[in-house]
């Protein structure tokens, strides 16, 4: 999992990018 995930935004742990 990414260590820089934001609690307010769902993250795509496969792409390591904010899923927005």
UniProtKB/Swiss-Prot annotation:
Enzyme Commission identifier(s): 1.15.1.1
GO molecular function: metal ion binding; superoxide dismutase activity
Top-tier EC class: oxidoreductase
Single GO cellular component term: mitochondrial matrix
Subcellular location, principal: mitochondrion
Keywords: Manganese, Metal-binding, Mitochondrion, Oxidoreductase
Cellular location(s): Mitochondrion matrix
Metal-binding found in the keyword field: yes
Named cofactor requirement(s): Mn(2+)
InterPro entries: Mn/Fe_SOD_N_sf (IPR036324)
Cofactor binding, per record: Binds 1 Mn(2+) ion per subunit.
Chemical reaction(s) catalysed: 2 superoxide + 2 H(+) = H2O2 + O2
Coiled-coil positions: none
Subunit structure: Homotetramer.
Family, per entry: Belongs to the iron/manganese superoxide dismutase family.
Known role: Destroys superoxide anion radicals which are normally produced within the cells and which are toxic to biological systems.
Protein name: Superoxide dismutase [Mn], mitochondrial
Organism expressing this protein natively: Hordeum vulgare (Barley)
């Amino acid at each position: 999992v990414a260590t820089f995930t934001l609690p307010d935004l769902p993250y795509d742990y496969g792409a390591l990018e904010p899923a927005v």
